[in-house]
C-alpha cells in the first residue's frame, strides 16, 4: 500500500486595515455640523484626479448616502466614502490637527507612494 500526500499551497492575504476616523476628526465634524444647523449632514471624503502628484483629497458635506458609499460612524458623526475613493483610502487615517500652521483635516495614507509638499495630493 502506498500513501500519496497531496500538498496544496495556499496563499493568505491579510485583510486591509479599515479606514481610521479619529476622535479629533469626528469632534470637529460634529462642531461644523452644529454650526450649519443641519443634523442630517455627513462628511464625504473623496479622491479625485488633480494636484501636483496626480490625485487629491476632497472634503464636503452631504445629506445623501449613495448605494456605493461606505459609511463609518464615530461618536454620532457619519463619514461617507464612495467606492472608487475607498480603494485609495483603505488603511488611511483621517484626522484633524491644530498647530501653529493652522487647523486642517489630515489624511495619513499608507497607499500613497509620493505626496506633494502641502500634503493635499498624492500618487500611488
From Swiss-Prot:
| Key word Metal-binding present | yes
Question: Entry's SUPFAM superfamilies?
Answer: HesB-like domain
Q: Which residues bind iron-sulfur cluster?
A: 52, 116, 118
* Cofactor: how and how many bound: Binds 1 iron-sulfur cluster per subunit.
For this UniProt record, give its keywords in alphabetical order, as a comma-separated list: Iron, Iron-sulfur, Metal-binding
One Pfam assignment: Fe-S_biosyn
What one GO molecular function would you report for this record? 4 iron, 4 sulfur cluster binding
Cofactor(s) this protein cannot do without: iron-sulfur cluster
* Transmembrane feature ranges: none
- Is Metal-binding found in the keyword set? yes
Domain of life (superkingdom) = Bacteria
Q: Return one Gene Ontology term, BP aspect.
A: iron-sulfur cluster assembly
Family under the similarity heading: Belongs to the HesB/IscA family.
* Job description of the protein: Required for insertion of 4Fe-4S clusters.
**Quaternary state and interactors:** Homodimer.
Protein name in the entry? Putative iron-sulfur cluster insertion protein ErpA
Which species does this protein come from?
Answer: Delftia acidovorans (strain DSM 14801 / SPH-1)
Amino acid at each position: 500500500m502506498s500513501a500519496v500526500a497531496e500538498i496544496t499551497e495556499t496563499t493568505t492575504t491579510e485583510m486591509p486595515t479599515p479606514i481610521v476616523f479619529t476622535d479629533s476628526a469626528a469632534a470637529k465634524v460634529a462642531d461644523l455640523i452644529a454650526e450649519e444647523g443641519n443634523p442630517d449632514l455627513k462628511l464625504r471624503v473623496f479622491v479625485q484626479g488633480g494636484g501636483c502628484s496626480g490625485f487629491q483629497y476632497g472634503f464636503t458635506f452631504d445629506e445623501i448616502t449613495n448605494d456605493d458609499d461606505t459609511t463609518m460612524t464615530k461618536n454620532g458623526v457619519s463619514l461617507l466614502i464612495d467606492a472608487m475613493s475607498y480603494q485609495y483610502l483603505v488603511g488611511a487615517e483621517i484626522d484633524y490637527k491644530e498647530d501653529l500652521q493652522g487647523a486642517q483635516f489630515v489624511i495619513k495614507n499608507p497607499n500613497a507612494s509620493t505626496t506633494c509638499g502641502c500634503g493635499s495630493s498624492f500618487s500611488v
